Every structure is written in C-alpha cells, then in structure tokens.
Amino acid sequence: MNSPISLDMGAITYNMDDLYKELAIYSNSTEIPLQDSIFCSTEEGPLLTSFKTIFMPVAYSLIFLLGMMGNILVLVILERHRHTRSSTETFLFHLAVADLLLVFILPFAVAEGSVGWVLGTFLCKTVIALHKINFYCSSLLLACIAVDRYLAIVHAVHAYRRRRLLSIHITCSTIWLAGFLFALPELLFAKVVQPHNNESLPQCIFSQENEAETRAWFASRFLYHTGGFLLPMLVMAWCYVGVVHRLLQAQRRPQRQKAVRVAILVTSIFLLCWSPYHIVIFLDTLERLKAVNSSCELSGYLSVAITLCEFLGLAHCCLNPMLYTFAGVKFRSDLSRLLTKLGCAGPASLCQLFPGWRKSSLSESENATSLTTF
C-alpha cells in the first residue's frame, strides 16, 4: 500500500505576491491564463518562440503598412464626399478610424515580443485599452450597419436627411464613448510585470495580484464576451437574415443588393477573423472559472491558440480596404480618380493590373446619380 506523502511546510516559504507575478507571466498575449492550483512551466516551445520572434515581426510589419495605407485611403475617399455620405458610409468611416487605432498598436506588439515591454506603465495601459476600444467599436459599428440596412430595406425607413445624419453622428459618438467605458478596466488595472529571472521578459498585462483585480478581470472578460461579441453578432444575424429574406422576395434593385452584399461581406470577414479568438478566450475563461478540468497540457494549448488567434484578429485591420476595392464598384471608381489625381495610376492601368476591374464597371459607377461606397 502506498504511504501518504508529507511535506515539511516549514521548510518551504512563498511570497504570494511574487507567486502571482510568476504565474501571470504565461505568454506574450495580453490575455494571460492564471492557474491558482496548478504550477505549470512557463517555458515556450521552439515553434511558438520562432513564431513570435521571426514570423510575427515580419507579418505585423506587412499588416501595418497595408492597414495604414488602406484605411487612410478609405478615410480620404469618404471625407471627399463628406456632405453626400450615406449613413452606411458614415459608419464605415468610423470603422476605418477604429482599424487605424489597431494599426497603431502593432509596432508595440512587435517590440514586446522581441524585447519585452520597456515603454512604461502609461503606454502599457494606453495600448491595451486601444486594443479593446477598437474591438468594441468595430463590432458595435457593424451591428449599426446591419440595423441601418434592415430598417432601409425591410421596413423602408427613409428619414429626413438632416435629422437622419444627426442621429447617425450621435450614434457613432455614443459608440466611441461606450468603447472607452468598456475599456476602463484595462486603463485601471493594466501594468508592467517585471521578470524574476533572466529567461523572461517584462510583460504588459491585466494585473491580477489581488482579489479585487481578479474580479475586475473576470468582469472585463464577461463584458468582452457579451457586449463585444455575442450581442452584436446576434443583432447582425437577425438583421441580415431579414434583409436577405426580403431581397429574395423582391428580385429587384440590383444596386441595393450589391450594397447589402458588401455589408454582409464586411461583417463576415470580421466574424471569421475574430470568432476563433473569442472561442479560445471563452475556453480560457471557463478554465479560469474551473468550469472545465484544468491541466498544464490544456493551459499550454490555450497559450498557443491565444497567440495564433490574436494574430488572426489583428490582421483584420487591413482587410476591409481590400474588400471595398474588389467588391465595391463605386469605391473602385473613387479610388481610381484619386490615384489618377495623385499621378499614381488611372483606370486603364488598374484594369490591366486587376483583370476583374472592368472598365464598364468604372464607367457605370461614374454615371451613378448618388454616391455609394458599394
């Protein structure tokens, strides 16, 4: 019969604050799994280390350049037609601003992965908060686009233009305010955790060194899952199901169908990029709540999955301009005119570079009587 194992607890002393800090430095992600009762190794495998130190800097640099140029072009094109912008285009303008905010934090992510966080607490709080603000504003703006299309197509709501634009601007301002308020936990509790050995790097994380901070972390996670993802996704699904059903009933107005198609594509790309991250984060939350059996193996898998899925989500910031370019007829026309004015390219060269860009589509959009990004 196996004899029980006894430990001389007097010979082992722990500083609990140091223990919390050691356990908090789990991965390079801002979402850090913390185990209360399972002591797992924090050493990363060679593949994940190579991914963070070699692939991520190159990929994030490319995303930074594409996202910066693409979203600035979107803002310039939409700003040129500020007085004739539709409600959907106003939402897309703010969506491009949110994506630019996400683009700005990519260099910080690259630097942290290479040398750790060396930029102090203020920038640590700012960068983590901007990450959350971007996601909240993006999801809420896409939900507003879905509601706007639903009201315009299913219920044929066409309000007086000035009153409608005023309500759109108020809605966008409210979304930005909500995004800031939802990111307050990050502004209050994010901090730089210094390493306790030469193998670790300083990390910018959501501090969980006491019970109050841990509760704030759980509240932030709950808000992230529900207000930032689940509820907006349900709103989008409900609205677009109604829109598609109405368009299938009335086989008319192909221009309106194209507008809805691009809106659905933008929403779909957002969900494809961010859904894996939210699924993994939700599993991590369940593990933290001990709703699932915790193990070092599961924690290791979650650490790798969080890093990979967060990369996919961050890549989203450069995809919307590409989508507008290849799926939006009027946007292509505006982009072509802008590039021609800048001396970069004209419709003919763009059609040669992209065979799918038919000159007919460019001329068709130029003859349109109303501006539409789609």
UniProtKB/Swiss-Prot annotation:
Per the record, ranges on the Extracellular side are 1-57, 112-126, 191-221, 283-306
Q: Record's Gene Ontology CC terms?
A: external side of plasma membrane
What's any GO biological process attached to this entry?
A: cell chemotaxis
The family database entries (InterPro entries) matched by this protein are listed as: CCR1-9-like, Chemokine_CXCR5, GPCR_Rhodpsn, GPCR_Rhodpsn_7TM
The subcellular localization recorded is:
Cell membrane
Q: Does the keyword Ligase apply?
A: no
Q: What is its main location?
A: membrane
Please name every pair of cysteines joined by a disulfide bond in this record: C124-C204
Q: Which CDD domains match?
A: 7tmA_CXCR5
Q: Does the keyword Transmembrane apply?
A: yes
* Glycan-linked positions: N28, N198
Output the Gene Ontology terms for molecular function: C-C chemokine binding; C-C chemokine receptor activity; C-X-C chemokine receptor activity
What the protein does comes down to: Cytokine receptor that binds to B-lymphocyte chemoattractant (BLC). Involved in B-cell migration into B-cell follicles of spleen and Peyer patches but not into those of mesenteric or peripheral lymph nodes.
The entry's family comment says: Belongs to the G-protein coupled receptor 1 family.
Q: What is this protein called?
A: C-X-C chemokine receptor type 5
Q: Which organism is it from?
A: Rattus norvegicus
Gene (name only): Cxcr5
